[in-house]
């Protein structure tokens, strides 16, 4: 079965998307956005949803004057083909209480991976922002990966590594090749995690990787990248099967992130996202799910604050301590996030 890549999906669906703070909301969508932002948060006693601390485990930043992002080209991503900095992010949180963030690598040119890691370590060392850790980029398919990781192996601000697996030049099954598996095992020995960002029809490979690397914590990004509006029944069945297999591995977790990008720009509502999100929450259980913002990529469909509001709307009937696990506590535990 042909598998859909995240960027191929973006190319097909987001040419008319709106970027968060840089572009005004279109007139036809103002009422819906306003209603979403004004939805009364769940309240228990004197505490409501907007009092909950949030750890955003998927904060992208990129400075295009410094880094090259080979994937950031074409009409689909034109509106995010500019620099996005911490100062931009901090202006977009709305009523939401983001107290910690974990940087997520941005698939820079491989020659710049070390520089990217050093850049975000600098941000982690500053007190004027909430970044407490980072998932850095790395080429786990390379025999040089161990050498690359040497400077970061004992740094507790480096929480883990990601290799994007859905790029066109990365074949199905790459994460199960011998060198790749050995490097994922090596991450476990270092106490680092590995993020799985892969095609929805290939999640079973991720489940197998979890079996081969029992000492390494794996986190499936973006609910497994299944488009919320897809009518491809075979793909959905393959995704669900893979997610169930992954959930059977106690070392594998699910990140509730990225899903908003697969919704219809300027024509989505929280109920469009709910089936995929509820499936993930039910399959993995609340103790193995964690929140991610995926900013600025999320802005191809919705501003960051609207994505957070939508997720709060979807889970509003859950107890606030349950929600605190999803939005904050699980992230701190899974990624071993430490205070500044």
Language-model segments: which ranges?
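Conserved, mostly hydrophobic/aromatic
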Residues: 58, 101, 134, 187, ...
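Active-site gating/metal-coordination segments in enzymes
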Residues: 38, 111-202, 208-211, 224, ...
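Mid-to-C-terminal alpha-helical segments outside catalytic/metal-binding sites
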Residues: 3-57, 67-70, 75-78, 82-100, ...
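Catalytic pocket-lining loop regions of alpha/beta-barrel enzymes
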Residues: 65, 173-290
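Short helix-capping segments at alpha-helix termini
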Residues: 126-130, 157, 212-217, 249, ...
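Short, electropositive alpha-helical surface patch
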Residues: 111-127, 216-220, 270-282, 306-314
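Active-site gating loops and adjacent loop-to-helix segments of metal-dependent hydrolytic enzymes
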Residues: 63-102, 155-171, 216-217, 224-229, ...
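Active-site metal-binding loops of divalent metal-dependent hydrolases
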Residues: 59, 106, 223, 294-295
